[in-house]
Design a protein with these regions (language model features):
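Donor nucleotide-sugar binding/catalytic pocket of nucleotide-sugar-dependent glycosyltransferases
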Residues: 121-138, 142-151
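Membrane-proximal helix-turn-helix segments that form the acceptor-binding/catalytic region
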Residues: 80-95, 104-126
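Hydrophobic faces of well-ordered beta-strands that scaffold small-molecule active sites
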Residues: 60, 96-98
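Short, flexible/disordered intra-domain loops and linkers
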Residues: 67-80
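Histidine-centered beta-alpha loop that forms part of the nucleotide-sugar donor binding/catalytic region
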Residues: 63-64, 100-103, 131, 150-151
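N-terminal pre-catalytic "stem/leader" segment of glycosyltransferase-like enzymes
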Residues: 2-63, 67-69
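P-loop/Walker A phosphate-binding loop and immediately adjacent motor/lid segment at beta-alpha junctions
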Residues: 14-20, 78, 85-94, 141-148
Length: 151
């Protein structure tokens, strides 16, 4: 079968909410994106797609909440828009994954802290890179679904 032939398979569509790969010096998200793509999942790495696209994604994966809203965001309206976008994608069947890299950034303002709260509580599953993070998160959010993937 060549690339032009249609199949009955519906590929999973995933979005990693992170700036476009060519615009980063952080290799975590690009490597993750490439590894996921190798499994046959249709994945893209884009912050703009989260805010502007109407694409129906199956999975939306958050990395750093401050990456989603802006690293030094001081616009209180971004919180309303974040909640709207999550509702929009969820209404189209999206499931949310959050990789918890940090408990909170060292210098988070109220808007960044609120973005963390929203993403933490709205994610269907939270990925942790260590047991301390998973235990801490489960204590804060007893109903959460958590998985540890050591790195």
């Amino acid at each position: 079968m060549n690339d032009c032939e249609e199949t009955n398979d519906k590929a999973i569509k995933a979005l990693i909410v992170f700036r476009e790969i060519s615009d980063t010096d952080n290799l975590f998200a690009p490597i993750l994106c490439d590894a996921i793509r190798m499994t046959g999942i249709d994945v893209r790495c884009s912050k703009e797609a989260f805010w502007e696209s109407d694409t129906a994604y199956d999975i939306i994966h958050f990395q750093w909440p401050e990456e989603v809203v802006g690293w030094n965001c001081d616009d209180p309206d971004v919180i309303r828009r974040l909640e709207e976008r999550i509702r929009f994608f969820r209404s189209r069947g999206a499931h949310f994954v959050y990789t918890r890299h940090n408990v909170r950034p060292h210098y988070a303002n109220d808007i960044i802290s609120r973005a963390y709260d929203i993403i933490e509580t709205q994610s269907d599953i939270v990925v942790h890179m260590g047991h301390f993070s998973a235990d801490d998160f489960a204590a804060r959010y007893p109903q959460s679904r958590n998985v540890v993937i050591l790195h």
